[in-house]
Amino acid sequence: MFYSYPYKALSFPIQCVWLKLNGSWPLTESSRPWRSQSLLATAYIVWAWYVIASVGITISYQTAFLLNNLSDIIITTENCCTTFMGVLNFVRLIHLRLNQRKFRQLIENFSYEIWIPNSSKNNVAAECRRRMVTFSIMTSLLACLIIMYCVLPLVEIFFGPAFDAQNKPFPYKMIFPYDAQSSWIRYVMTYIFTSYAGICVVTTLFAEDTILGFFITYTCGQFHLLHQRIAGLFAGSNAELAESIQLERLKRIVEKHNNIISFAKRLEDFFNPILLANLMISSVLICMVGFQIVTGKNMFIGDYVKFIIYISSALSQLYVLCENGDALIKQSTLTAQILYECQWEGSDRIEIQSFTPTTKRIRNQIWFMILCSQQPVRITAFKFSTLSLQSFTAILSTSISYFTLLRSVYFDDEKKLD
């Protein structure tokens, strides 16, 4: 039923299982219900829309609470932390559901052009796997976060100092259009419904970020392999066959370079909306979580731990993505330097014979490649911002500015009340 990529040795990170569980993984062409009337495919699509609906409904409950408590800056900022994360991943879920064909084509293109098998006789695949460890750390932090949101209210119920049967806690601050406290059945069903919506939000966040990082990491790996091929461009060709061999090698290098650039553009095109929403919301989220940690009064110790994990996971998620985007920029621009250093200028020093001299035709092609390679390959958020460490520092700077402003407003209000 699920789309099976052409290259059988391709294995995605374990986090991607959650995209299948949340209904976001593309199905095969033959599994489409309007073509083969597959009951499993139909059930899967219905499940996918149920997940989206449950997240949307939970966000509406949180928004109702937010609007009802706008006058309290502490409650507002606390609620914004979960509401904004929900909105971000609600957008992600809808984007993945509405762009299944693009997602399928992206996976297919990756399997043919970018994937580096683990059995490859080079250390590039091992380096790519090593770089993916950072996404496991990010996943662990986010998993701890949602577990704390779902478990801490239960700890409060069973081990808290005082239990109010009419004001039982939920994973997040919400207002319902019905009385969720009227009976234990209603409470339990509402708790399970909203908790699972939160699980879908967090798992979609780390699963989609992981697959984006997976694509970028192996694209960087392909640039590394390309650099190795460029370094050996003029090795082992005799004088009679020099030009023909060099031209053939250069042709394959150009084709591979174009394929890598083409995949990076498809990757950017697919993840554009998600990255834009992520970068816009991240600065606000980091600001508000930091504000909660600094200004929280009479807060349960578990809530402090929860917010510390929250800000750690938000920072790690943003840093890992920006660092991978920065690595792609560096690897792509390094191509020009590798081309320049590949001994293409040998024809002016034929007497040295330390390597096969190049013809003017080959030099012209290499010069053109150097010119093209000076333009970095990068992933942007609709061209508004580039995924790079520079963007990461800019977002942190913006978050600190928001935090300073919010803190000033809060303490000014405190002084007026005193």
From Swiss-Prot:
Task: Give the chief site where it resides.
Answer: membrane
Annotated GO biological processes are: detection of chemical stimulus involved in sensory perception of smell; signal transduction
Keywords attached to this Swiss-Prot or TrEMBL record, sorted alphabetically, are: Cell membrane, Glycoprotein, Membrane, Olfaction, Receptor, Sensory transduction, Transducer, Transmembrane, Transmembrane helix
Where located? Answer: Cell membrane
Q: Where does the source fall among the domains of life?
A: Eukaryota
GO molecular function list: ionotropic olfactory receptor activity; odorant binding; olfactory receptor activity
Which residues span the membrane?
39-59, 71-91, 141-161, 196-216, 274-294, 300-320, 386-406
Glycosylation (residues): 69
**Regions of this protein lying in the Extracellular compartment:** 60-70, 162-195, 295-299, 407-418
Report the InterPro entries cross-referenced here.
7tm6_olfct_rcpt (IPR004117)
Outline which residue ranges sit on the Cytoplasmic face: 1-38, 92-140, 217-273, 321-385
GO-annotated cellular components: cation channel complex; dendrite membrane; plasma membrane
Expressed in which tissues: Expressed in olfactory sensory neurons in the antenna.
| Pfam families named in the record | 7tm_6
How does this protein lie in the membrane? Multi-pass membrane protein
Q: Which family does it belong to?
A: Belongs to the insect chemoreceptor superfamily. Heteromeric odorant receptor channel (TC 1.A.69) family. Or1a subfamily.
Functionally, this protein is described as follows: Odorant receptor which mediates acceptance or avoidance behavior, depending on its substrates. The odorant receptor repertoire encodes a large collection of odor stimuli that vary widely in identity, intensity, and duration. May form a complex with Orco to form odorant-sensing units, providing sensitive and prolonged odorant signaling and calcium permeability. Involved in the behavioral responses to octanol, nonanol, and pentyl acetate.
Miscellaneous remark of the record: The atypical heteromeric and topological design of the odorant receptors appears to be an insect-specific solution for odor recognition, making the OR/Orco complex an attractive target for the development of highly selective insect repellents to disrupt olfactory-mediated host-seeking behaviors of insect disease vectors. Odor-evoked OR currents are independent of known G-protein-coupled second messenger pathways.
Tell me which PANTHER family the record gives.
ODORANT RECEPTOR (PTHR21137), ODORANT RECEPTOR 13A-RELATED (PTHR21137:SF44)
How the protein assembles, per its UniProt entry? Interacts with Orco. Complexes exist early in the endomembrane system in olfactory sensory neurons (OSNs), coupling these complexes to the conserved ciliary trafficking pathway.
Provide the protein name: Odorant receptor 13a
Q: From which organism does this entry originate?
A: Drosophila melanogaster (Fruit fly)
